[in-house]
Amino acid sequence: ADYLRLARA
């Protein structure tokens, strides 16, 4: 999972 992108959501 792309946690780096999810945190930017």
Swiss-Prot record:
Keyword Secreted: yes
BP GO annotations: neuropeptide signaling pathway
Function: FMRFamides and FMRFamide-like peptides are neuropeptides.
Keywords: Neuropeptide, Secreted
GO cellular component, one term: extracellular region
Similarity comment text for this entry: Belongs to the FARP (FMRF amide related peptide) family.
Main location class: secreted
Transmembrane segments: none
Protein's name in the database: Extended FMRFamide-2
Compartments, as annotated in UniProt: Secreted
